[in-house]
């Protein structure tokens, strides 16, 4: 997506002296786009159930009970009921997402993540790709990416490698934490797709509103580099990253991308959305 965007920009008049770069960027973009197929993960409902059961077994009792009581999609059954066999409309066709990477045997590392934000903002995804991204954001963690304080950047619940649940937890910089700039990029990307996929405007608007509400729930932490969360109180609660003994790194309170939200407010207003326009 980034290469394709670069190619389009290099075709502008001010870059005409760089004659070969636009074609090379677009050629590489096409090659990488075709290489995405091995990264696609598609799980059947029975596989989703089993992998979620395995993941929940790695959590504390308090975490597990909280997640089991949460709904699987809007109006869906509780996660406990789904694991016991109840049908969840949001998962009737299973669950698809892009793998985090490929392993040494070129097999997908089945960790769900939020990097589709780049595709939404810079790429030309088809309807199916946009719907796949929306589905991940419509589903609460650990089924999807969304928490009450923003989308996590990685969800290891579906990985067959038991190390990932441990190494990509709430204390890991690249784990089940919320990155402010990634969430902002997803919002900007969906605002763009709102124009390109008019038949999906209703779903996109609901996800955009949810993204905004969740970031507001993070309060002052929403302007920091990243934050983690807890559910021990019986609800989602944003927590500063790097403060706990289990944290593997620390967070810088304010970085350049912390200033991205005024631009997003402008885009919201341009789109005529009746969502909260202030943070």
Show which residues each predicted segment covers.
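Acidic, mature catalytic/reactive cores of soluble proteins
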Residues: 1-279
């Amino acid at each position: 997506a980034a290469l394709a965007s670069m190619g389009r920009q290099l075709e502008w008049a001010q870059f005409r002296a760089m004659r070969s770069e636009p074609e090379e960027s677009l050629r590489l973009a096409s090659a990488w786009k075709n290489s995405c197929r091995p990264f696609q993960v598609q799980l059947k409902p029975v596989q989703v159930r089993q992998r979620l059961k395995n993941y929940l077994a790695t959590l504390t009792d308090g975490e597990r009970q909280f997640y089991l009581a949460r709904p699987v999609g809007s109006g869906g059954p509780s996660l406990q009921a789904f694991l016991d066999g109840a049908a969840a409309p949001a998962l009737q066709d299973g669950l698809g997402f892009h793998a985090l990477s490929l392993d040494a045997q070129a097999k997908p590392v089945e960790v769900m993540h939020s990097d589709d934000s780049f595709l939404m903002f810079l790429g030309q995804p088809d309807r199916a790709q946009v719907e796949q991204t929306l589905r991940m954001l419509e589903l609460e963690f650990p089924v999807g990416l969304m928490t009450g304080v923003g989308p996590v950047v990685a969800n290891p619940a579906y990985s067959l490698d038991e190390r990932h649940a441990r190494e990509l937890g709430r204390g890991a910089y690249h784990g089940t934490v919320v990155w402010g700039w990634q969430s902002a990029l997803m919002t900007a990307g969906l605002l763009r797709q709102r124009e390109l996929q008019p038949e999906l405007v209703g779903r996109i608007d609901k996800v955009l509103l949810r993204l905004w509400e969740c970031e507001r729930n993070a309060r002052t932490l929403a302007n920091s580099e990243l934050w983690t969360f807890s559910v021990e109180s019986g609800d989602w609660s944003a927590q500063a990253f790097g403060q706990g003994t289990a944290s593997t790194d620390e967070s810088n309170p304010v970085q350049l991308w912390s200033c991205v939200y005024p631009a997003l407010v402008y885009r919201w207003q341009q789109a005529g959305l009746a969502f909260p326009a202030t943070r």
